[in-house]
Amino acid sequence: MWLATPYFLPTWSVRRSLRRAASKGLDVRLLLTGPRTDHPSVRYAGHRYYPRLLRAGVRIFEYQPCFLHLKMAVVDDWVSVGSCNFDHWNLRFNLEANIEALDPPLTAAVVASFERDFAQSEEVDLAHWHARPLWRRVKQRIWGWLDRLVVNFLDRRD
């Protein structure tokens, strides 16, 4: 189960599914945007989910060469490619679309694309995560808190 998205703010159910799959021994990998991003605040807000995912066995890769604006997923022979960022904004509020396919040649092409991108990414592990500088931790806390506040406010409007 490999997932690529530039804005990683998944819903609780998506995070739970990723953790459960990884804890069962499945190869769960996230390909996320690295330091070159158009919305640093969103990147920092999404970092709050890293520790639990890493402890569950999810592998997290941050793409280094440029801004990653890729949105795709592959699970076995199933592929999803499109405009949905797989975050709580797109899954709850925005109108986005993906195309899904069960097509072995397409799956092979998507897997090859993922493998090329993983090779150009920095893998985040728990040791790396715990060694990050204080200023980054502060940014992650602030943006994570603001994101949670906005989502909770918008959820109450329904």
Where are these regions (language model features)?
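PLD/PLD-like phosphodiesterase catalytic module centered on the HKD motif
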Residues: 2-158
